Curated annotation (Swiss-Prot):
Localization per Swiss-Prot or TrEMBL: Cytoplasm
One GO term (biological process): L-arginine biosynthetic process
Species assigned in the record: Actinobacillus pleuropneumoniae serotype 7 (strain AP76)
Oxidoreductase is among the record's keywords: no
Protein name listed in UniProt: Acetylglutamate kinase
Biological pathway: Amino-acid biosynthesis; L-arginine biosynthesis; N(2)-acetyl-L-ornithine from L-glutamate: step 2/4
Signal peptide: none
Domain of life: Bacteria
Amino acid sequence: MLQNEVENFANLLEQATVYLAPYQEKIIVVKYGGNAMINEDLKKLVMQDILLLNQLGVKVVLVHGGGPEISQGVKLLGKEPQFINGLRVTDQDTINVVLQMLAGKVNKSLVALLKGKGVGLCGIDANMLQCEKLQAEVDYGFVGEIVKVNTQLLELALSANLIPVISTVGVDDQGVAYNINADTVASEIAMALGAAKLVSMTDIAGLLRDRFDESTLIPEVEVSEVQGLIDQGIIAGGMIPKIACCTDFINAGGIEANIIDGRVPHAILVSLFGGKNGTLFYKK
């Protein structure tokens, strides 16, 4: 490496250290999904960035979904995937696909990209995600809601400087497996671990005043403003539960939560290094 290249690298590393100082030896929970998970090039970049953060002393917990793979598996059974109010209807065949694809294929493919630093887990392991059947006006089948997060296994992995990669399957006290919303899992784990930051990767630019115009991005929202934005219809539909996960985390003591655009290369690093990506939620 030439002298000027060494100097440039040293300067970049110094700048990165300044931005990462608030997160040194702290926990960041990343909910990973959307286009960044489907696009193979973006997927590799995300895993590279998480590896870099790990090497720089940030403790990253990765929570992932796997909607497209699950839908593909359901279609192979001759069924059409069903969704009501944004939640997947999960019958017995579908939960079997979830276990096979989400906790199996998808999880292990991500772990492999972390080059020996990842450890693949699902919520069933060591009763990490204890849940019960979701009670709603609609019967969603094997869809669960979390009643307790057991952090022992996660803490063990983090203390060994490993990156937990968690698929969003939980288990009830009878040993029945349930599919759980990934944003909810990420938020609950972040709260249970006392994480400093929650990051949710999406397929949109962030919270928009006009959902058809990305130039109307709202870069920052103080949590007390959220209800007003709901009343105005700016936060609507699937963004309501996603943002609720962010505000729950912050109100429980988290420093900040980001909804970021996963279509942007190095989206996680951009959000941590002071760049403009997505919407930041915080509390005064």
